Amino acid sequence: MDYKDTLFLPTTDFAMRGNLPQNEPKRFKAWYNERKVYEKMKAKRQSAGVSFNLHDGPPYANGHLHIGHALNKILKDIIVKTHYFAGENVRYVPGWDCHGLPIEQQIEIKLGGKKNETSKTKIREMCRAHAREFINIQRDEFKDMGIIGDWDDPYITMKFKFEAEIYKGLCEIAKKGLLIERSKPVFWSWAAGSALAEAEVEYKDKEDYSIYIAFDLSDEANKKIGAKGAKAVIWTTTPWTIPANQAICLNPDEIYVLTSENFIFAKHLLENLVQKGISKGKIVKEFASGELENLYAKNPLNDRPSKFILGEHVLMDGGTGLVHTAPGHGEDDYYVSLKYGIETIMPVDDAGKYDETIKTKKLFRDNVVDEFVGMHIFKANEKIVELLGDAVVSVGKFTHSYPYCWRTHKPVIYRATKQWFIAMDKPFKDGKTLREVALNALKEVKFYPEVGRNRITSMIENRPDWCISRQRDWGVPIAFFRDKATKEPIFDDEILNNIYEIFKEKGADAWWELDIGELLPKNCKYEAKNLEKVVDILDVWFDSGSTWRAVLKSGDYDAGEFRADMYLEGSDQHRGWFQSSLLVSSAINETAPYKSILTHGFTVDEKGQKMSKSVGNVIAPQEVAKKYGVEIMRLWVGLSDYSSDLKISDNILKQVSEQYRKIRNTIRFLLANVSDLKEIETNNFTMLDKWILSKANIAFEETNRAFRNYDFSKGFSVLLNFLSADLSGIYLDVCKDRLYCDELDSSRRRSAQSTMVLITRTLLPLIAPTLTYTVDEVMEFAPEIVKNGKKDAFDLVYEPLEFEDFKKNETGELFIESRAKFFEIIDTLKKEKKIKSTLELVLETSSNEILSHDLDEICDWYMVSHMRSIESRDFLAEFKVEDETFRLVLSDHHKCPRCWKFDAKNEDELCPRCQKVLNVK
């Protein structure tokens, strides 16, 4: 007879396979449209005592999303939901960065040769349309990932009011005296035709000249050190800067030597130069660097005088100890030359070519100068080396780390131009500088991981003044007027406020669309005819660094309060958004705009290599979603240690899919076995129920602590170990007999079901921040006893289980260790084909502690048919745990055709338990 229909087998409509790629889009669409889950999340927690807002670091509105975007937004979504499912009132307003060079370059490509004929207003209009197009594209792509946020009202930096707020912040900084305009060497992208901030520069290996050049000393300088025909030898990697040389800088504290070759070097570096073959090392004379100060050598390229000066920046870690100084091409060069009143010469134009300055300043000899006018500086290197002739002591090539424009990917140069800067070291607040205020503010910020604190602190300590001006079209203008006569900027409150109001109404385009008279307030004391406009625009990092003001302080967005609870971006943003936001906020508010910073690594392939189209190892999030599902991408983020680079590949995603399958099937088993339970019974928990509840309590709380500390990989490690080892590996397995075979309403069956419901209710909100789709699907198909009055995933709140640790008492240890040892022996017996199932066995033990418990429970624990005290001499195996003996004996009973336990007196006869359940004899 087939007894299958008499068993209480599991039943649920929650599918074994998620079919995520097919099903996710439908549920996501419902979240955004019919169910309005973000609005629901706000409404559900509006009376919560604790709030959390994550301020979104804006992605750039250009191009499609890549896997790095997916990592970033998923991690943000998980963290916001970690707070939400803990019962907190959360806010997340996504945003976009819209201004800047990449979009402008796209428009230049579209315009081709017509760019010069196109007005700034038209270019800006096209840039705005381009940004708008990609905001819509990226918004849909983010929503396709199931990211929850205020997608109906995101912040967009090119909105008129937003541009006005950026400008207002600039005005406040100007009025505090921190905005200065001066000519100074800055990173210059000749390919983009604009100045760059430090954050816009990336370093790559570049092959350059390594050249040692001898400058003849003047007669006076020779006489001063008692030499004849002495030569000061400098080392440089940029021969193209030699025409602009104005000085040779020595370290004020070092001793210098004259060698037998008549070369002057720092004594400290002589041995190194001997090894390089630059000198034989024989010292003729030693002297202090100060002896040459304010005397001259002669530039061998153009015979112009080069002044000997002293500077602390001259290090003894390479070169000759005599530093070629061109104040227009280096920051140290500029500052040290300033002290000596040396003129800054700039012979290079915006495009990186020599201009007419090389003629007027006689930077080349007359017979060759025409050849160099209009020549790109990098093409001039070889020709300059040739012209230097015998003055070249040594020349070669070497590879070194060199700054590149991160947008054009072309090498940049240092070039002195007139720019706007935010001063780092000018006192403004109680005598403190912006650098000091910012460093102070960082002390109040929490970092995840903590190493981020040292990184950004070091950067703030060592950074130069912030160059915020750009010579481009698409950005927020530095909308100030100058006095035509004096060229001084005018920071008049009435004018600045009027421009702010105009920008709010018409956008920053008004700066180019309106005449000066139209931009001035009525009855203004300044006359339009005496004024001129500043035509530079703001560094796009100033835009993003001002988002806290426009989003958190303006009242225009329901984004939470200033300061944000968290800023979260990739680790490169220590030098980018984290820093620009800190500086703008410190200048205006004297505080950081964030309470905490969390950083993540970059996505790399399985071998740890950077993703590159040329290498062919790029993984697009859209493809992952189509093949595996977004939920797998989310679990990949949850399982990964985001504090370092995250590896992703097809193989890794398959492994994550397997982990997801285990989680899903565990939940499915739990749901399927409680479908007939109407109310939880807590009075009759068995020892096994109490054991798994205590294990669940420990695992869930450790997981929750890790999640609340944003250590998701640790949390999932603990959780998955519990689900596979304790819950699925032991408890659910041993419960099958009482769930399927006991009477429907037996206390053992109901206590197991009650246990499973309690575990499920706690598990779902715990994993909901990461596996939101899955939990929402679970809630659709879960029986009412699991839902507990809740409608969907967004109604859930994590509440801990509270059960004591079962392993605290001695019996608990004995149970666990003996079971592990028992199943080790079972594996051997099965391999030896002595048994097929543990149900064929009787387990005998000398432990009175174990035998004092309910025997049915103990049988379930070891999954045997009988338990008894030691009595058999004929046994299959024997083992000891804690001085207690255990013997495995073949049962002399028959297999019950219903429950398969060896507890029937006769063949094909039901065991006593099954007879009772079916009411047969």
Curated annotation (Swiss-Prot):
Residues that hold Zn(2+) according to the record: 896, 899, 911, 914
Q: Which GO terms describe its biological process?
A: isoleucyl-tRNA aminoacylation
**What is said about the domains?**
IleRS has two distinct active sites: one for aminoacylation and one for editing. The misactivated valine is translocated from the active site to the editing site, which sterically excludes the correctly activated isoleucine. The single editing site contains two valyl binding pockets, one specific for each substrate (Val-AMP or Val-tRNA(Ile)).
Q: Which family does it belong to?
A: Belongs to the class-I aminoacyl-tRNA synthetase family. IleS type 1 subfamily.
Alphabetically sorted, this entry's keywords are: Aminoacyl-tRNA synthetase, ATP-binding, Cytoplasm, Ligase, Metal-binding, Nucleotide-binding, Protein biosynthesis, Zinc
Reported function: Catalyzes the attachment of isoleucine to tRNA(Ile). As IleRS can inadvertently accommodate and process structurally similar amino acids such as valine, to avoid such errors it has two additional distinct tRNA(Ile)-dependent editing activities. One activity is designated as 'pretransfer' editing and involves the hydrolysis of activated Val-AMP. The other activity is designated 'posttransfer' editing and involves deacylation of mischarged Val-tRNA(Ile).
What is the designated name of this protein?
Isoleucine--tRNA ligase
Q: Which cofactor does it need?
A: Zn(2+)
Annotated source species? Campylobacter hominis (strain ATCC BAA-381 / DSM 21671 / CCUG 45161 / LMG 19568 / NCTC 13146 / CH001A)
- Motif 'HIGH' region: which ranges? 59-69
- InterPro entries under this entry? aa-tRNA-synth_I_CS, aa-tRNA-synth_Ia, Anticodon_Ile_BEm, Ile-tRNA-ligase, Ile-tRNA-ligase_type1, Ile-tRNA_ligase, M/V/L/I-tRNA-synth_anticd-bd, Rossmann-like_a/b/a_fold
What remark does the entry make about the cofactor? Binds 1 zinc ion per subunit.
'KMSKS' region (motif): residue ranges: 610-614
Q: Which GO terms describe its cellular component?
A: cytosol
Matching entries from Pfam families are given as: Anticodon_1, tRNA-synt_1
Q: Which NCBIfam families match?
A: ileS
Q: Organism's domain of life? A: Bacteria
Residue numbers binding ATP: 613
Instruction: State how it assembles.
Output: Monomer.
Where is it localised? Cytoplasm
